[in-house]
Amino acid sequence: MKQTLIVGGPGTGKTTLAKTHPDPRHADDLIHGKAWSEQSDHLASQIGQGGTLEGAAVVRGLRKWLAQNPTGRLEGTEVIHLSQPYIPLSAGQERMAKGIETVWKEIAPELRRRGATIREGS
């Protein structure tokens, strides 16, 4: 099943880009009200469900999915990584962006190895 996952820090255009794809879902809407530990689990359960999923928390869901599915494949999954913010960030947003990039660098090689197509945006 084809799925597009759009990842990146705050202000990078994830939501705007997602609106140009079929069935866009915003990660924050899916995890609202869930405890921190449950958020990654819930997002991991969305991997492979088709459509488009975007949000800053998606990298955590991908990391959790990789850990939970050690032999799982991601053919048909496109991951778009956006790293350049288009707006000035607050100090908190800058810290969040740094954390997201750290997780991204950790998981990107494994995503490729498992068959995901990765597209780097700006």
Each language-model region and where it sits:
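Hydrophobic anchor at the beta1->P-loop junction of P-loop NTPases
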Residues: 6
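Short, well-structured alpha-helical interface segments that form or flank functional binding sites
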Residues: 12, 16, 57-58
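Conserved substrate/cofactor phosphate-moiety recognition/catalytic segment
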Residues: 9, 16-49
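Pre-Walker A adenine-sensing motif
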Residues: 1
